[in-house]
Amino acid sequence: MSKKLYIKTWGCQMNEYDSTKMAELLHSTHGYDVAEEAEDADLILLNTCSIREKAQEKVFHQLGRWKNLKKNNPNLLIGVGGCVASQEGNEIRARAPFVDIIFGPQTLHRLPEMVNQVSETHAPMVDVSFPEIEKFDRLAEPKADGASAFVSIMEGCSKYCSFCVVPYTRGEEVSRPVDDVIYEIAQLAEQGVREVNLLGQNVNAYRGEHYDGEVCRFAELLHLVAAIDGIDRIRYTTSHPVEFTDDITEAYKTIPELVSHLHLPVQSGSDRILTMMKRGHTALEYKSKIRALKKARPDIAMSSDFIIGFPGESDADFEATMDLIQSIDFDMSFSFIYSARPGTPAADLPDDISEETKKKRLQLLQQRLNQQSMAHARRMLETEQRILVTGPSKKNPMELTGRTENNRVVNFVGQPHMIGQFVDVRITEVLPNSLRGELIREEADMGLRVDTAPEIILQRGKSSEPDELGVVRMPRQAS
């Protein structure tokens, strides 16, 4: 009977990606299969996020639920990873001594050694170091789970925005070698993946090395990914306006695989607040980048993030944010009331805005964003949209569901063989959280672009032998 692994994941898409890699890694080295419930597991991992308020207390609350499982099964191993573990490792050891393994986002690749050592010595382990690119060298081969996949191309952030904890929990920017990224995507394409979402805390700051030492910038990487046959959609998240350079804008003119949707967080429309946030750009510079992008790709849909109630935010600052929203006309966006993150510069600023004011501003801002979002959805009525079919609809299993380029969910009547393929539909109804469509054509009638077959990329380097833990390292091209 195989050993069971249960992973609970909180936070961003990068954490989701990391959890997938943990499961693949521990399956390849120790034979762990994923359990649906913590009660059935031999190893429980909590992958944490420190972005939201009271993140630490949320962790201890969850660990308290698992404490009895450990008491009833002394052989059960419990590990805590992610950004809270990186930030609060010693506190976790002190308040939850029954936790066996504490690891950071950059040391998840060492999980097999940690599991071995804890099993042998019965002594807890803590490793929240920042060993840079080593993490990616030790990952198991990717396994596709559907037609869309996440691929991490870099880690960390070097922008040090005053409100953000990421540089302190995930470290500064480290880019994967470009050949490793392309090889992983080719492996996924071989398994039927049609859409990749390139991940990074500051993804458009990517500076990965080729095997010959030459540096590949993000725009060049987009061209290389688009050339892989089978990859017909490229998304990426999360971007920073400062790193959104002209060559990336130009890529939207020449790469049809790049979806007509961009998430570009701005946080505020006030130059004064942007300066206090240490964002490195003005509202006008942000608008200028969007104008250039819409000139390159007129139908592009924009989304963003907004922080409300940052320390010192005046009525005028808030109105500047509302004006920016009005001028950009976002397709959809995310907004949050500011909460101080321990250890960040902004945490030392006085919280001089009442909760009532914060909530009122958030309500007004979300009302405007929702109005814009619904207006965009209504404009899609009776239009033809290409969607990637991801599976049966959650609300009606007799229907299929997929996403448009601008990330809208569409449900329609179709056949099971369409799952994992593209179809064109006519939008027939606009609902609050989704769209309905009517099938127009299937993928066989589309004539999608064909370029470099994945097997050609995979043949460029043969996999090395598994290491002592059974991990096959990513092959590198020889010069």
UniProtKB/Swiss-Prot annotation:
Binding, [4Fe-4S] cluster 1: 12, 49, 83
SMART domains, sorted: Elp3
Catalysis: reaction(s): N(6)-dimethylallyladenosine(37) in tRNA + (sulfur carrier)-SH + AH2 + 2 S-adenosyl-L-methionine = 2-methylsulfanyl-N(6)-dimethylallyladenosine(37) in tRNA + (sulfur carrier)-H + 5'-deoxyadenosine + L-methionine + A + S-adenosyl-L-homocysteine + 2 H(+)
Domain TRAM intervals: 378-441
Gene3D superfamilies referenced in this protein's UniProt entry, alphabetically: Methylthiotransferase, N-terminal domain, tm_1862 like domain
Enzyme class per UniProt: transferase
Boundaries of every MTTase N-terminal domain copy: 3-120
Compartments in which it is found: Cytoplasm
EC code(s) of this entry: 2.8.4.3
Signal is among the record's keywords: no
Cofactor: [4Fe-4S] cluster
Residues the record lists as binding [4Fe-4S] cluster 2: 157, 161, 164
GO molecular function, one term: metal ion binding
InterPro entries hit by this protein: Elp3/MiaA/NifB-like_rSAM, Methylthiotransferase, Methylthiotransferase_CS, Methylthiotransferase_N, Methylthiotransferase_N_sf, MiaB_methiolase, rSAM, rSAM_horseshoe
Keyword Metal-binding: yes
Domain annotation Radical SAM core: ranges: 143-375
Keywords assigned: 4Fe-4S, Cytoplasm, Iron, Iron-sulfur, Metal-binding, S-adenosyl-L-methionine, Transferase, tRNA processing
GO cellular component, one term: cytosol
Cofactor binding: number and manner: Binds 2 [4Fe-4S] clusters. One cluster is coordinated with 3 cysteines and an exchangeable S-adenosyl-L-methionine.
Biological function: Catalyzes the methylthiolation of N6-(dimethylallyl)adenosine (i(6)A), leading to the formation of 2-methylthio-N6-(dimethylallyl)adenosine (ms(2)i(6)A) at position 37 in tRNAs that read codons beginning with uridine.
Similarity annotation: Belongs to the methylthiotransferase family. MiaB subfamily.
Subunit structure: Monomer.
Name listed for the protein in its UniProt record: tRNA-2-methylthio-N(6)-dimethylallyladenosine synthase
Annotated source species: Idiomarina loihiensis (strain ATCC BAA-735 / DSM 15497 / L2-TR)
